[in-house]
């Protein structure tokens, strides 16, 4: 359970517009990687126009005089390993790629079908947004509106015109990638929060694409503002019909302008903060979770949003954005209805004027993409000379001075073309029927838990079956006299006298006669002596200084006298403890620890079997026996457990505490306090219970695609802890495959903390081989001896704890802990590979399954963000995997998000969605496979554009919609 070497503290990047920080200019290409301006040939752009930034019609936050205020340009932060949350790294390159991916789809539907510029214009410089009612250029620049409408009105009088129009309609999407291949497209999210610099760059691109000089560009700023409203309403009537149609075609999904860590910054100094709902601004409210550990235990507890992609998942899964999407769709549909009626009125006016003049009007207008790119549906490429756009500045001035109606410039449209146009529009609208997006229900923001009340969840011992009599068997080793087992009495060891086995199937004990040590006799000859006798001699000396303890340990570990470091132990003794505490340590606690350690052959009389891979075996021993074994581990007496590499016990965790004594980490004194609290308690009063260690190895797993079991009940909360609020439940240890992780080293995250406050767990490291993919370790009966505060670097021993857990018929505390190790993903996308998903499902299923036990006798699973944090797991995927595994094992789930309220709501919404639609385990698993195929397999960026939960919502709704139609397959 280690955060690993990659978890280093990260600093915030300066935000533009913050105090003392100025936004880079639009011309600074270094500030916008991959976004350099494209300047066309000067002859293609003889005249440039700028929209005055002080225009009152401009929308605040996009452009205008607020250059000094906080902009909405929010950069992704580096991972911050803090108390509540973990973010993953995100490079500038990946951010650029991701923005490109998210912007390409809506932009493609906005690109014109025609090549409006014959003057060698190969690329479209800047594609405007589709949100017509919020475009700042539309509100502030009347001449843009006039030019836009003129572009809409370009029609050819020939009868073949309608055929070209209908034939060219599909090209709206197919031609877009070619036009956008090298276009200077704004890569920031399409929200109300464009920065001033970004908007200036947009306007510059529009101006370079304008090869004519318009007459009304010479108007004053005041005139432009006064006329903008009336001009805009008149010019947008014809354009909105096609614009609304194309908006449905594009299926635009607006992304959030906010990052998880920037919600507070955006809210200050911006005029758009009234648009933020509580859920948007609350994405980064909960303080982040700090994750630190050593390489042995990179397992960590995540928030969630463990990574940059999570935070992105939060943005995608937020119901606020979906509501905005629906509002945009409704507004576009309304625009379609209005503009259709207005278009018919315009056509009638056109015919009257055409008959009066008696001659064909041929006008060529310059289309400018500054306000409404959606009008491209009305513009098909004309043939012959009519495609040339030879409009000079003089003709533009004349049109501007006459101030004529825009409908004066329409060419007569034949009636046959009118009918064809209407039929085409009807067909287009029918084909565009969309499946409505699922919007998760709004949940009360003040709720601390959601789902089934925790009081209704099954707990031990009330839900359990009556245990059979405790008896040893071929699959169960019992090291005490079961016939003398009494409540409140210290169990008697079995057999009565010590039995030694020195082989590769049992623990090699320090007190074994085979534990020999080279010594020199009186004649100087080297002979083999008993190492146990040397241990007894060394430890029976009095310890008044830490140096005495160091010398005693090295006396029987001579080979490591120059390798082992005791700095942490010396500093703890000399610098951390008060004089009275140090005196109590060497006068009382250490002598008692020596006594119980040297009683090992009288307490642990039976050889302890090694729990090797592929074994299904249990070991039940007394708490007193465990205390004696741990005292020997503290004094580093276990033989053959210090060598590394390909040694005999290289596939087993460390058991001797020598690594706990090294270094100057601030974690070590708190670890030593916690362990000395345990040793003081068990030496002052002998414990009377039993503890069972079970290695479970499964060969048969569900066929996940065909598993028809429904999801079980869920209680999810962002408050509390697994050990504190999951009493009587199956409590998940987010384990390292070497159980205990870095508990005897520098690790101090979820697993290590649990092993410290329940130190009897540490003895499992003595005999449990590294876990395989289909295995878990189940520990029942350990007692909690300490309370703590903090996490990782902030961990502090608080006080001694009296465990009030009930005891079962075997005199075990009703505390069941399962150690399951998750995979370590170095690439975010790897965890969605079907083989990896199946492995994690099998691992969780192995930990949750109890063969032969009825579901009504199984307690709920108390778990959390398993395999997240330093292991790179996505919290939402891991939550769904655990829900599926628990459903297959027929157990309820109590999920702790460790302070992440947004994750709590997301998990609950997903669980509610799946259960209401009666999606069983197999159907959800197939959705996970489909997500990999459609979103992850061919993804070139670090993370997919569509996050998991939004994809499941849409895919499940699409499948339900399709299944309602006869003859259609569901696609899941």
Swiss-Prot record:
The active site is at residues 733, 751-752. Keywords: Acetylation, DNA damage, Hydrolase, Nucleus, Phosphoprotein. Residues 87-100, 193-205, 342-351 have a biased composition (Basic and acidic residues). Residues 605-790 are annotated as: Catalytic. The keyword Hydrolase applies. One of its GO terms (biological process) is positive regulation of DNA repair. The modification Phosphothreonine is found at residues 137, 197. The modification N6-acetyllysine is found at residue 337. Substrate binds at residues 722-723, 736, 750, 791, 865-870. PANTHER family: POLY ADP-RIBOSE GLYCOHYDROLASE (PTHR12837), POLY(ADP-RIBOSE) GLYCOHYDROLASE (PTHR12837:SF15). Poly(ADP-ribose) glycohydrolase that degrades poly(ADP-ribose) by hydrolyzing the ribose-ribose bonds present in poly(ADP-ribose). PARG acts both as an endo- and exoglycosidase, releasing poly(ADP-ribose) of different length as well as ADP-ribose monomers. It is however unable to cleave the ester bond between the terminal ADP-ribose and ADP-ribosylated residues, leaving proteins that are mono-ADP-ribosylated. Poly(ADP-ribose) is synthesized after DNA damage is only present transiently and is rapidly degraded by PARG. This is Poly(ADP-ribose) glycohydrolase. It comes from Rattus norvegicus (Rat).
């Amino acid at each position: 359970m280690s955060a690993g070497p990659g978890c280093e503290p990260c600093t915030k990047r300066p935000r533009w517009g913050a105090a003392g920080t100025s936004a880079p200019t639009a011309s600074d290409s270094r500030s916008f990687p991959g976004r350099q301006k494209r300047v066309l040939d000067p002859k293609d752009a003889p005249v440039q126009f700028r929209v005055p930034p002080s225009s009152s019609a401009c929308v605040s936050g996009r452009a205008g005089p607020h250059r000094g205020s906080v902009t909405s340009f929010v950069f992704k932060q580096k991972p911050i390993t803090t108390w509540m949350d973990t973010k993953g790294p995100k490079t500038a390159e990946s951010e650029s790629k991701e923005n490109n991916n998210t912007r390409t789809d809506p932009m493609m539907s906005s690109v014109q079908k025609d090549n409006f510029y014959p003057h060698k214009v190969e690329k479209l410089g800047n594609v405007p947004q589709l949100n017509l009612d919020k475009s700042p250029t539309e509100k502030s620049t009347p001449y843009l509106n006039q030019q836009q409408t003129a572009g809409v009105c370009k029609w050819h009088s020939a009868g073949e015109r309608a055929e070209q129009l209908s034939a060219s309609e599909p090209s709206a999407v197919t031609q877009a990638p070619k036009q956008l291949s090298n276009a200077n497209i704004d890569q920031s999210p399409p929200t109300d929060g464009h920065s001033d610099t970004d908007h200036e760059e947009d306007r510059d691109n529009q101006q370079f694409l304008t090869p004519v000089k318009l007459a009304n560009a010479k108007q004053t700023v005041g005139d432009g503002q006064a006329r903008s409203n009336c001009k805009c309403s008149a010019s947008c009537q014809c354009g909105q019909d096609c614009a609304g149609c194309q908006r449905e075609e594009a299926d635009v999904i607006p992304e959030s302008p906010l990052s998880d860590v920037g919600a507070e910054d955006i809210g200050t100094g911006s005029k758009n903060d009234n648009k933020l709902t509580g859920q948007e601004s609350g994405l980064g409210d909960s303080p982040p979770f700090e994750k630190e550990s050593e390489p042995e235990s990179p397992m960590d507890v995540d928030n969630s949003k463990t990574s940059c992609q999570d935070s992105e998942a939060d943005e995608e899964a937020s119901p606020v954005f979906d509501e905005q999407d629906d509002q945009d769709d409704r507004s576009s549909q309304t625009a379609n209805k209005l503009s259709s009626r207005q278009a018919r009125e315009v056509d009638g006016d056109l015919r009257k004027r055409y008959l009066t003049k008696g001659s064909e009007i041929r006008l060529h207008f310059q289309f400018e993409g500054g306000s409404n790119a959606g009008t491209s549906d009305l513009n098909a490429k004309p043939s012959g000379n009519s495609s040339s756009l030879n409009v000079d500045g003089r003709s533009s001035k004349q049109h501007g001075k006459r101030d004529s109606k825009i409908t004066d410039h329409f060419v007569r449209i034949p009636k046959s073309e009118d009918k064809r146009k209407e039929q085409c529009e009807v067909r287009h609208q029918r084909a565009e029927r969309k499946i409505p997006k699922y919007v998760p229900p709004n949940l009360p923001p003040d709720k601390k838990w959601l789902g089934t009340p925790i009081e209704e969840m099954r707990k031990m011992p009330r839900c359990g079956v009556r245990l059979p009599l405790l008896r040893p068997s071929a699959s169960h080793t019992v090291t005490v006299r079961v016939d003398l087992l009494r409540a409140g009495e210290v169990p008697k060891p079995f057999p009565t006298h010590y039995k030694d086995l020195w082989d590769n199937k049992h623990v090699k004990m320090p007190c074994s006669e085979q534990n020999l040590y080279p010594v020199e006799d009186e004649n100087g000859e080297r002979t083999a002596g008993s190492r146990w006798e040397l241990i007894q001699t060394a430890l029976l000396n009095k310890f008044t200084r830490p140096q005495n303890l160091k010398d005693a340990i090295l006396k029987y570990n001579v080979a490591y006298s120059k390798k082992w470091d005791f700095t942490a132990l010396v500093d703890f003794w000399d610098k951390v403890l008060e004089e009275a505490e140090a005196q109590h340590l060497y006068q009382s606690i250490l002598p008692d620890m020596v006594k119980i350690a040297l009683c090992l052959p009288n307490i642990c009389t039976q050889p302890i079997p090694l729990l090797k891979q592929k074994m299904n075996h249990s070991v039940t021993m007394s708490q007193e026996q465990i205390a004696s074994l741990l005292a020997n581990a503290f004094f580093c007496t276990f033989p053959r457990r210090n060598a590394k590499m390909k040694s005999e016990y290289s596939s087993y965790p460390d058991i001797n505490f020598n690594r706990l004594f090294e270094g100057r980490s601030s974690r070590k004194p708190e670890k030593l306090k916690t362990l000395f609290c345990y040793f003081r308690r068990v030496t002052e009063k002998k414990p009377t219970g039993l503890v069972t260690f079970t290695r479970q190895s499964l060969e048969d797993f569900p066929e996940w695609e065909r598993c028809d079991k429904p999801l079980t009940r869920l209680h999810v909360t962002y408050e509390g802890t697994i050990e504190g609020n999951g009493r009587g439940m199956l409590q998940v240890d987010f384990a390292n495959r070497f159980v205990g992780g870095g508990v005897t080293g520098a690790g101090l995250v979820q697993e290590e903390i649990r092993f410290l406050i329940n130190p009897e767990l540490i003895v499992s490291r003595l005999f449990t081989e590294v876990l395989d993919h289909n295995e878990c370790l189940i520990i029942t009966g350990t007692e909690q001896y300490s309370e703590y505060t903090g996490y990782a670097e902030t961990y502090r021993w608080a006080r001694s704890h009296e465990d009030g857990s009930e005891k079962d018929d075997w005199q075990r505390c009703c505390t069941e802990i399962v150690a399951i190790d998750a995979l370590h993903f170095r690439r975010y996308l790897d965890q969605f590979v079907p083989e990896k998903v199946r492995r994690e499902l099998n691992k969780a299923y192995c930990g949750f399954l109890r063969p032969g036990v009825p579901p009504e006798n199984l307690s709920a699973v108390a778990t959390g963000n398993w395999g997240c944090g330093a292991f790179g797991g996505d919290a939402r995927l891991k939550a769904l995997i655990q829900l599926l595994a628990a459903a297959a094992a027929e157990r309820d789930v109590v999920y702790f998000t460790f302070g992440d309220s947004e994750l709590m709501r997301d998990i609950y919404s997903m669980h509610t969605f799946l259960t209401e639609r009666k999606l069983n385990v197999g159907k959800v698993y197939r959705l996970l496979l489909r997500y990999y195929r459609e979103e992850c397999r061919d993804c070139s960026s670090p993370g997919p554009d569509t996050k998991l939960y939004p994809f499941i919502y849409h895919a499940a709704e699409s499948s339900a919609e399709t299944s309602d139609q006869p003859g259609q397959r569901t696609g899941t």
